[in-house]
């Protein structure tokens, strides 16, 4: 967990260090959240002035605590999601940010989508490549997933790290070995050529 103050401090430090393309991610449709809550959040975001924002409609993951407590929260989640999405789109426009990518996930609040907004020239190519699954990604840390893309074979391979941070630290050698093995895998076509 982090606080609003920690976000503001981290953002300020990043700017002081010279970062000139900062994205902020927001989740809308949280339990008990209203469009007025989202409006207040967006006003704070506007004060900071990030170069891009990504607005995620809440997607309930199967392994999440919210999924386990769904019966308790289902009537309080995403009730006003269309108004929330409108608030974020309008504020992004006021900030001079334009939509540059959109993607959907399973189990999204209100059956909405995630939208990336960016200032001209500040679109995050990484986000586009990730969503289109066009780029190999080597991920580090607990709960992350490395994904290898083999475009010539229309094939993707994934290696997930353990989610628990303590387990990740205890098993770091295993995690590194799995990743190294995956990153040195030759495409299937290379193996077929060698056999011919």
Give residue spans per PLM region.
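Conserved non-cysteine loop/helix-boundary elements of the Radical SAM core domain that shape
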Residues: 1-88
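Asparagine-centered polar/low-complexity signal
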Residues: 21-23, 114, 127
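Short glycine-aromatic motifs
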Residues: 94-97
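Radical SAM enzyme core and accessory elements
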Residues: 116-196
């Amino acid at each position: 967990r982090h606080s609003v103050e920690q976000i503001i401090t981290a953002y300020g430090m990043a700017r002081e260090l010279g970062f000139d393309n900062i994205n902020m991610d927001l989740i809308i449709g949280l339990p008990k959240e209203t469009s007025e809550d989202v409006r207040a959040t967006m006003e704070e975001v506007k004060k900071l002035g990030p170069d891009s924002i990504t607005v995620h409609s809440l997607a309930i993951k199967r392994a999440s605590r919210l999924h386990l407590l769904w019966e308790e929260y289902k009537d309080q989640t995403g009730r006003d999601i269309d108004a929330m999405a409108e608030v974020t789109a309008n504020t992004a426009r006021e900030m001079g940010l334009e939509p540059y990518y959109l993607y959907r996930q399973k189990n999204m609040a209100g059956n909405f989508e995630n939208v990336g907004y960016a200032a001209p020239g500040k679109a995050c190519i990484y986000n586009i490549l990730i969503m289109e699954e066009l780029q190999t990604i080597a991920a580090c840390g607990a709960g992350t997933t490395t994904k290898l893309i083999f475009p010539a074979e229309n094939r993707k391979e994934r290696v997930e790290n353990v989610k628990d941070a303590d387990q990740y630290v205890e098993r770091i050698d295993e995690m590194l070995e799995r990743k190294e093995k995956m990153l040195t895998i030759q495409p299937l076509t290379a193996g077929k050529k060698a056999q011919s």
